[in-house]
Amino acid sequence: MSAHVATLHPEPPFALCGPRGTLIARGVRTRYCDVRAAQAALRSGTAPILLGALPFDVSRPAALMVPDGVLRARKLPDWPTGPLPKVRVAAALPPPADYLTRIGRARDLLAAFDGPLHKVVLARAVQLTADAPLDARVLLRRLVVADPTAYGYLVDLTSAGNDDTGAALVGASPELLVARSGNRVMCKPFAGSAPRAADPKLDAANAAALASSAKNRHEHQLVVDTMRVALEPLCEDLTIPAQPQLNRTAAVWHLCTAITGRLRNISTTAIDLALALHPTPAVGGVPTKAATELIAELEGDRGFYAGAVGWCDGRGDGHWVVSIRCAQLSADRRAALAHAGGGIVAESDPDDELEETTTKFATILTALGVEQ
């Protein structure tokens, strides 16, 4: 926990917008890198609202804060919309051939007769450089304009300290991790995807193929089943549709399932729920421990990619989204790191999985003006 650190950038410390409105932080009163300390402040009333980002590995420092105040609005302010500086891909991390090798390693483990692993999400990254400092507000507005149904977000990561000081996470996630309003709980997990196409007939064919894909439906069901197990001790009257729905963004078709329920104990807060669910198999795997251990071995620290971004107020209400389709901007805003991943099961084709990550990169790279 530390005092507010001033920044030269005119960006807010936090913004989250979506179909139900926008929440923007004004200033920072207190910062927390320790999730448990932040939860304690919320429960004691010291923190009237808590907001920020959770890393993929919650044993790592978080980027949570208590703001001086918040602005709630229907949409984002009229932030700058001018052009961004030229952005280029400096490196692929790892190179595509190495990513294919990682998938092959995962498939061997998944196919093992007595192996514990059923699914693992493997990601790759691209390192980006800009000719001049990037404005995170411009990037966020571009993302939201491109997909108004997504959850656009911007988080100052200074609370996490060290290399994250001054950095910012900016993205537009299609995936709601969890929302709490009173005793009502809602989750909308995503797993299974296919690319969009400019030709309407091909686009419809891609959607239909996804909906009927045994591999993608299996991958999706693993996510839903795991979330059911996590939610049952916390919620009653769980409603989980038997079949997933199709959801589309500008670049990707997804399978998704809307899950609803009622809290068994009203003292369970939105951040409690987020921590109980994270990381879901949509970004980690099944079982969680085996999958996250393999991810750590093959990828190293993911940082805030595939974590969660959101807020929780003193009543326990809040929204948390999965931090995908994003980039972490460096403190000087002249560099960025973007990730994309895909769910690997025994039936996965490595080339298809590589192509899936390329498709998923499109959201953030298009907003940055990167030629693909």
Curated annotation (Swiss-Prot):
Keywords on record: Isomerase, Magnesium, Menaquinone biosynthesis, Metal-binding
Task of the protein: Catalyzes the conversion of chorismate to isochorismate.
Disulfide bridge positions per record: none
Similarity remark: Belongs to the isochorismate synthase family.
Annotated protein name in UniProt: Putative isochorismate synthase MenF
Any one Gene Ontology BP term: menaquinone biosynthetic process
PANTHER family reported in the protein's UniProt record: ISOCHORISMATE SYNTHASE ENTC
UniProt KW Lipid metabolism keyword: no
Catalytic activity: chorismate = isochorismate
